[in-house]
Regions:
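Conserved nucleotide-sensing/catalytic segment adjacent to the nucleotide-binding pocket
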Residues: 80-127
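Conserved mixed alpha/beta catalytic, RNA-binding, or beta-rich assembly cores of soluble enzyme
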Residues: 38, 73, 78-84, 194-295, ...
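Glycine-rich phosphate-binding P-loop
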Residues: 38-62
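C-terminal binding/interaction regions
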Residues: 199, 214, 274-361
């Protein structure tokens, strides 16, 4: 099985270099046994302790007579793209909650006379990192944060326009994510202001995401929540709220039909199948909303596929939805949002709740 080791908290980390690079600092951490010459250190996200783990291990290896090295593989920002290239700005949008800012690497500029892009956290920590390296090895092998990175992504770009367009779409998606996070009270308004600034700097508008005007128009037409889905080939469908199911379910079924070439008038799931599910939800499970969620509709579709060849065809078309774009005119439930993501669909929604209840799932 997998082993585990303890990492101790070090007082005044990372500023107290003398303490950090001592037996009372990194020396208190447990040594990680390895069997290969190259070890990859990965973690769930930023601030998880990847760099601290690597530096601690360097200290531990040095004590054992092994002069190990360290390099960082990080895709964004891309060091050899312009500071304000949309790809690099998309990285800022993705890390708006961390307040990351792309910057010209001053250490690289001074050392090599070359302009490269890095981000504030790496630039701010580099003097500390440099001192730690010198304390362990007597010298630092890197002259800049850019030196420390391993990143060839910029050389792999063969269609700059496609990368720019993908970046625009990512920034718009991140804008909606931040707007909804602020609405839910799990993010500060400053995060949304950062996204708005990035949108304005590139002259972006949310209508550039095709599903947004489509969902808004359907909601205005019906006076109820609506959703829109853009298939990978660019075709667009919408879904409206009904007594049987929510707009997300309707849009999902319509997308499946379109992808599978099934006539829009065909009912994939018999009302006789849906009615007992609604009865179960209301009468036995205590739900007040009889409309079905996406997971319930997909289960009903899979049951129908046993006896209905058209429903079976629809089930097989689910995989073709991966990479589709989804937008809802209201904040989706965690169930519906999670289901779209599990299907590999990129989902956004307006920062508006469907109801005015105090608690939202």
């Amino acid at each position: 099985g997998l082993g585990d080791v303890y990492k101790r908290q070090i007082a005044d980390y990372p500023s107290n270099i003398n303490l950090i690079v001592s037996d009372d600092g990194y020396g208190k951490n447990e040594y990680i046994e390895t069997s290969r010459p190259i070890v990859i250190v990965t973690a769930p996200g930023p601030g998880s302790g990847k760099m601290a783990t690597c530096l601690s291990q360097l200290y531990q290896e040095h004590k054992r007579g092994v002069n190990a090295g360290y390099a960082k593989y990080e895709t964004f920002p891309i060091w050899n793209l312009p500071l304000k290239h949309p790809v690099n700005l998309a990285y800022e949008a993705a890390t708006a909650d961390l307040a990351d800012v792309n910057m010209i690497d001053p250490f690289h500029l001074e050392a090599y006379g070359e302009t490269t892009v890095n981000y504030n956290r790496d630039i701010e920590i580099f003097p500390v990192l440099e001192t730690i390296f010198r304390s362990i090895f007597g010298e630092c092998p890197y002259k800049s944060p850019t030196d420390m990175g391993v990143n060839m992504a910029g050389f792999a770009i063969c269609d700059d326009e496609a990368c720019r367009e993908a970046s625009y779409q990512e920034i718009i998606r991140r804008y909606f994510a931040s707007a909804c996070a602020v609405k839910k009270g799990i993010a500060m308004p400053a995060e949304l202001r950062k996204q708005e600034m990035l949108m304005n700097s590139l002259h972006l508008d949310v209508s550039m995401r095709k599903t947004v005007p489509a969902a808004r128009a359907k909601a205005a037409e019906t006076g109820a929540p609506a959703a829109a889905i853009e298939l990978p080939d660019g075709r667009l469908v919408t879904g409206k709220t009904s007594g049987l199911m929510g707009a997300s379910c309707a849009a999902l079924l319509n997308a499946i039909k379109l992808s599978a070439g099934i006539d829009d008038r065909v009912n994939l799931i018999s009302p006789m199948v849906l009615a007992p599910i609604q009865h179960l939800k209301i009468e036995h499970l205590g739900n007040s909303n009889p409309r079905l969620h996406t997971d319930e509709v997909l289960i009903a579709l899979s049951i129908s596929a046993v006896t209905n060849p058209t429903a079976e065809l629809a089930m097989e078309a689910l995989a073709s939805l991966r990479g589709s774009q989804v937008h809802s005119s209201v904040i989706l439930s965690s169930v519906d949002e999670g289901m779209f993501k599990r299907l590999g669909m990129n989902v956004t929604f307006e920062p508006v709740y469907q109801s005015h209840t105090l608690y939202h799932k």
